[in-house]
């Protein structure tokens, strides 16, 4: 059952995407009105506005992504105050990176770290522009950080995927370490694996591409092509290995398409012994790991118009999808590769299209589903 918990009128124009911080109860929006807004995920505090970031981009902000904490979301550094940072990709072909200064509070650093969920999500923090990243020739369609916050991926209508490297502690410089030209059309989305340096891109050319560094850690290249959709692939997300339904011997990916389908793809994971054996080969014959991906499942057909967004919960293993028909659909896996519909919510944003769904946790750690639509609303749902 999908029940509306709260509705936020975030913008007077379309909300393209939403990002949730991996460890803090805070979300960010991306809108056609060229601004980003941050809200605290606290029902007790009535989901207050934390910050508004504007006057930087000349055109729509299409995508936002919070940087994970140092050490990753699963194992953040416990003795380090990791200040939140946000990347925003725009149709003006640039990416902005935002962050906050260390809070000016009367506590010592240990107390600040212990209470960071409150202190770092306070409206009293000032969000500052830290960097503008330039490189793409056309609109930036999506941005996403890897699980350690060292790499930022971006994609564009210029058919390319770029990978930028930075020092996750300072975010002072962003160096382009790869420009990947494997797609033949507009690239709609990029998404990193939650705990591995593997990247997926989704495109207007109807394919998904998988990228990984070579064994020596020098070059990034395409190691897998997922063919099967018969229309634009709008979005793809990896399954978290923390999920209660995850199999540690394989990788899985869910994708959403213009062809009205939601698909699950699977590939075997290479074991550490195999990787070590390849490292011991001479570099002249050492090859990148090619990954063979197959369709494991096509989820039950529900959507009548293009599916724009999918989200895979690390907490429950449930998948949510949404798109042009205004429906939110939630699916559960009953046995390996067999999925059933949990619930369908029609008209989740009235007559408007839904551009994004993500899973998030409130400050009380209860999981919710967040949706964003053409109506300018961000809706929070109990599942």
UniProtKB/Swiss-Prot annotation:
The keyword Cytoplasm applies. WD repeats lie at residues 10-49, 56-108, 135-175, 182-221, 228-275, 302-341, 349-383. It comes from the Eukaryota. Pfam families: WD40. One of its GO terms (biological process) is iron-sulfur cluster assembly. Interacts with NAR1. Essential component of the cytosolic iron-sulfur (Fe/S) protein assembly machinery. Required for the maturation of extramitochondrial Fe/S proteins. This is Probable cytosolic iron-sulfur protein assembly protein 1.
